[in-house]
């Protein structure tokens, strides 16, 4: 499975996805990294790994549709099968989402459907929730919406601040996202009518992750 990653910055989740695809016996390969930010540091890392990179400055396009079309053209020309957002700070238009329907993952640093959007950690603390975490989900046209593939959970402690909570959740992201990508690469999960279908092997892998 040929994978493209979309980033806007450093792309720490991108790094973990690349590392997971460098292991033996994986059916996924990272074949291109695209950023809407020409100065994204993640581009240099991907390039150092021999991965093709592209920067497409969204500010040079008159609207979202034209930008999406440019991204889609690059993905298509590189025979990409599947996309992962890794800190990609742009909202996709409906046409782009349809083109990559059920072939496009995102990770969000909260337990969806709670705390969609930005500033998730401080909002979770302010609301007094006792648990937070991260969510891997299929991309849909709504912000941080789509079928949930898996979630990882951590406690929100009484002395937490946004920085401390963010660090713990980022550690979970770095483990969960590569795992979910590999589940799709190995055909262990699928989507039917917006419901996630798990094989017994997928359930076993996810249970082991949560232990």
Each language-model region and where it sits:
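N-terminal Rossmann-like dinucleotide-binding module
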Residues: 1-41, 45
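Donor/substrate-binding cores of folate-linked one-carbon enzymes
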Residues: 20, 82-198
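N-terminal glycine-rich "phosphate-gripper" loop used for MgATP/nucleotide binding
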Residues: 35-36, 60, 64-65, 78-94
């Amino acid at each position: 499975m040929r994978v493209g990653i979309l980033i806007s910055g450093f792309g720490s989740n991108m790094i973990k996805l690349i590392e997971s695809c460098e292991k033996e016996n994986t059916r996924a390969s990272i074949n291109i990294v695209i950023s809407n930010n020409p100065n994204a540091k993640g581009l240099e890392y991907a390039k150092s790994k021999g991965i093709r990179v592209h920067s497409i400055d969204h500010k040079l396009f008159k609207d979202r549709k034209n930008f999406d079309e440019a991204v889609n053209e690059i993905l298509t020309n590189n025979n990409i099968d599947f996309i992962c957002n890794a800190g990609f700070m742009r909202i996709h238009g409906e046409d782009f989402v349809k083109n990559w329907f059920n072939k496009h993952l995102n990770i969000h640093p909260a337990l969806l459907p709670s705390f969609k959007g930005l500033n998730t950690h401080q909002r979770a603390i302010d609301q007094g929730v006792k648990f937070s975490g991260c969510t891997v989900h299929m991309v849909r046209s709504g912000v941080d919406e789509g079928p949930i593939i898996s979630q990882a959970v951590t406690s929100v402690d009484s002395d937490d601040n946004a920085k401390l909570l963010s660090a713990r959740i980022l550690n979970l992201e770095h483990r969960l996202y590569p795992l979910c990508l590999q589940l799709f690469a190995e055909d262990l999960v699928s989507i039917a009518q917006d419901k996630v279908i798990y094989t017994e092997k997928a359930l076993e892998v996810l249970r082991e992750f949560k232990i």
